């Protein structure tokens, strides 16, 4: 008998302790839009947020300071930028400790691909980053991009309409409460029954699940989907670029306006 229950995901639980989250799904499945919906919660604790991505993604405008975005087009550039970021984190922690304060960091890797599975510094962060008050979020199109040597430390597995076989492979190393067979049956049941293609189905590890046999679900926020700017998300993060906040927000508004005009033109022509 499957004793698992479906529950609404509590985003506030992500603030309790460092986490390692994997968001897996195909292109256009809703991974990024859901991640952006988590920001209003995450910035309550994580004041230093860094993004690693191979190409510029305008979706992150207004969510992450430009000087905290690292473009990593090769294995070497990913390794280099991570080593440099780790050094900066260690310096920030030392300064915070001198002032009897704590600093918390979040590293996001968006569609970096198979470079993730070969990155030694990322594996170190997955396995030992808790000691640096660092949490990790990986956005991947397939579980294969999650480093094998770091899968045992994944705390949250977020499925966006992926195959059950892929979910099974991901869960093999992840420490979960209950039988994996029951988890997979429940996952399949929810994916089949819920018509929302962008539904996030979240499996927590044995610590974050709070002793419950549960699978959580969540959806992106309406304001994020409608691209409504929330200035507090940037304001609550540390950056040397805060003095340029107005210019950054104006740039974001201009891009949104141009996008809307382009969409309107297409509708008229069609």
Swiss-Prot record:
Highest taxon of source: Viruses
Subunit comment: Interacts with protein OPG137.
Family membership noted in the UniProt record: Belongs to the orthopoxvirus OPG160 protein family.
GO MF term (any one): ATP binding
Stated name of the protein: DNA packaging protein OPG160
Binding residues annotated for ATP, in chain numbering: 55-62
Keyword field: ATP-binding, Nucleotide-binding
Matches recorded under InterPro entries: A32L, P-loop_NTPase
């Amino acid at each position: 008998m499957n004793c698992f229950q479906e529950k609404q995901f509590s985003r506030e639980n992500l603030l309790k302790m460092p986490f390692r989250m994997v968001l897996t799904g195909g292109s256009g499945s809703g991974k990024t839009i859901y991640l952006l919906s988590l920001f209003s919660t995450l910035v309550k604790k994580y004041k230093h947020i860094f993004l690693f991505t191979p190409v510029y993604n305008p979706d992150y405008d207004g969510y992450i300071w430009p000087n905290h975005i690292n473009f990593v087009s090769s294995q070497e550039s990913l390794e280099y930028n991570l080593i440099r970021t780790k050094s900066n984190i260690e310096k920030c922690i030392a300064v915070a400790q001198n002032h009897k304060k704590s600093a918390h960091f979040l590293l996001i890797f968006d569609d970096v691909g198979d470079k993730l599975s070969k990155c030694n510094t990322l594996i170190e962060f997955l396995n030992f980053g808790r000691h640096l008050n660092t949490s990790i979020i990986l956005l991947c199109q397939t579980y294969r991009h999650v480093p094998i040597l770091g899968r045992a430390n994944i705390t949250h597995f977020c499925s966006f309409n992926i195959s059950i076989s892929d979910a099974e492979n991901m869960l093999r190393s992840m420490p979960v409460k209950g039988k994996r067979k029951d988890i997979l049956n429940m996952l399949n049941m929810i994916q089949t029954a819920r018509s929302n293609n962008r539904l996030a189905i979240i499996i927590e590890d044995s610590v974050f699940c709070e002793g419950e046999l549960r699978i959580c679900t969540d959806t992106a926020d309406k304001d994020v989907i409608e691209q409504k700017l929330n200035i507090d998300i940037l304001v609550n993060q540390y950056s040397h670029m805060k003095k340029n906040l107005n210019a950054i927000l104006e740039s974001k508004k201009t891009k949104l306006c141009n996008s809307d005009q382009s969409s309107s033109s297409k509708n008229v022509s069609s």
